[in-house]
Amino acid sequence: MAKKKKKIKLNANISRRDFIGGTLVGVGAALLYSYKDVINTVSKDPHGVINDSWTGYGGVGDYAISNGNVASTRDAAHLIRNGFTNKMRADAEETGEEYDMVIIGGGFSGIGAAYEFYKKYGNTKKCLILENHPVFGGEAKQNEFEVDGYKLYGPQGSNDFGPPLKDSGGLIANIYRDTGLPFDYDFVKQDPKKTKVRAPLENYYGVFWEEERYDTGYFMGKDSKTPWVINPRADKLARLPWSDKFKAELNRAFDDKKDYYTGADLDQWLDSMSYKDLLEKVMGFSSEVTEYFDPILAISMGGVGADVYSGYAAKLLEMPGTQARYAYDKSKNDHDVGAYSFPGGNAGIFRHIIKYLIPKSIKGGKSFEEILFNPINFSALDNTENPICMRLNATAIDVSHEGLAKNADYVNVCYHIDGKIKKIKTKTVVMGIGGWVAQNIVSDIPDSIKTAYSQFHHSPILVVNVAVRNWRFLDKLGISSGRWFKGFGRFFSIRRPMITGELTQPFDPEKPAVITFYVPFNNPGYPVKVQGVLGRAELLRKSYAQYEQEIVEQMTEMFAEYGFNAERDIAGIVLNRWGHAYISPQPGFHFGINGEEAPKEVVRKGFGRIQFGHSELSGYMSHTLALIEGSRAAIDVMKHIN
């Protein structure tokens, strides 16, 4: 009989004490009660918040009640998915409000549409953004911790950015100029007396693309002859306990110098097959190589296995064999590589844009540090004096033209807020949300768009931020990033922090830090739709406590031999569950099949006074493409505004 695992107990001061005013906020609190009441109660507790037994500990600060898909937004989305909103719509209260544009979704897509609206109309027209979460930003939110006198931040979802060139044109560069986002960034200088560990400036490059630049470890299991192999690519994987054949295949994949197709239609050719078929049928690799790359695809942008992922989509990730080679250049320093991370991920970018559109949305002035760290002024977001307003905890349940789309002068929007259904009118709508919701709430959606949306598939990710009181155990190991092949999760990383004034985070093994874990839920061997469904079921079924225990056990297994003690060293764990984190483009998604129009192009057409603008339409859900898609949708639909 197997020995029963001893449950590791965390210090009660880590999270169990963190109730709101001594009372646990129940599932759906943000929908059932006044948002103002929730915010006021949160602000009373400096230690942090446990929102409910499923959402769990949220950290401290404004984002503490909005870590990932919290229970309230999950439940509201499932009501929409399951078709329970018809009666709610019939009971809607007409508010008498009328807008020139209503944007559904307060993430990067929505804010990209709002930016375009404001650039054209300034203070002369009215726009309302409806956001279903308790805090704006979509996946561009942050987790905050207070540990031993230090304020620490980690990305909830959207992370990793590269600033445009100062003299460049285009939407993204214009946003930087208008909002005051810097074009140049500095990072904490490494003190070799404190640590010699090389850490990335963001959370991804240490686990594949720039693995040779940074100190990365492969955990082979605590019972392995060599549990950790440090920097395995330094000697072409020689120390890994894998077969010589497999290691030779991986080295050939990493080298990636051969062209496998010379036609002018390379992208279409790649989109005609899965990445697995490219690796195995075209490049001649074994299935072991595919299995090696599967979790890399899953955490970076795909969410699914290579067996259902378009080869062209893999090219967008610069994966081997796609002729978009990512070459490690040792002559560059890591700053020159140009992949950075704000303390709270791309929340730093979003906060600059919202401050530009609604100047009082973040308290204080316009300095870089103030915008990054000052409290959100929630009362300023939905102020009728603003040309652009944002209404939080407002879940859209129905969007439809007033009459036939081709003749309509208005669109009616019904939404749920504070336990009531409200109805407003608008001249135009931008659906800045994913198709898994959009197709269910736009009730007069044409069959052509509905059919196209049936070819959009999405997959989940779990991002876990673990605040530790020190990272001596990583320093002793000599790593900043890690990868493992069995157990909970697959990757973790710490970053060398960005310099952000007085709140610059330390880079010292003796001081606190945030370790970010990426947990994929890919299920190779199943159809693309099924992989997403299975992944979401796994993501959603466990309580916070169950995940907490798995994380602690995994960290203990990997790090206990190097001085790690969970009860002593962990200061907080925040889960960020994203049920539809990624579009998972199957072969044909980008360029169509058998001469048919690609599904994303069908949706981009919109209809009547409603346009769709979400990063999924690019087949690659990044913050820049979200801004671009939202901008495009707004420009298209603004032709209906007089």
What kind of region is each of these model predictions?
Residues 155-166, 261-268, 335-344, 450-455, ...:
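Active-site rim elements
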Residues 388, 392-516, 520-525:
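Mid-domain catalytic core of redox enzymes
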Residues 44-90, 212, 416-417, 467, ...:
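Conserved flavin/dinucleotide-binding core of flavoenzymes
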Residues 100-115, 130-133, 428-435, 465, ...:
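Conserved beta-strand->loop/alpha-helix structural units within folded catalytic cores of enzymes
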Residues 15-32:
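N-terminal export leaders
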Residues 251-394, 404-408:
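Active-site/ligand-binding neighborhood in enzyme catalytic cores
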Residues 58, 75, 89-267:
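N-terminal glycine-rich phosphate/pyrophosphate-binding loop and immediately adjacent elements
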Residues 1-14, 41-44:
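N-terminal secretory signal peptides
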